[in-house]
Amino acid sequence: EQCGRQAGGKLCPNNLCCSQYGWCGSSDDYCSPSKNCQSNCKGGG
């Protein structure tokens, strides 16, 4: 895990989104609030 609650609240570098599973990425699977994105989400989540 790289980010979010699984990584002690870390944020992703380069404004990447943090997925519900604690990984950084830029696709909808990482960024969509409906997929429980944790940080830097699309839609201001």
Swiss-Prot record:
It comes from the Eukaryota. Disulfide bonds join 3-18, 12-24, 17-31, 37-41. The keyword Disulfide bond applies. Keywords: Chitin-binding, Disulfide bond. Residues 1-43 form the Chitin-binding type-1 domain. SUPFAM superfamilies: Plant lectins/antimicrobial peptides. Pfam families: Chitin_bind_1. GO terms for molecular function: chitin binding. PANTHER family: CHITIN-BINDING LECTIN 1, LECTIN. N-acetyl-D-glucosamine / N-acetyl-D-neuraminic acid binding lectin. Can inhibit fungal growth. This is Pseudo-hevein.
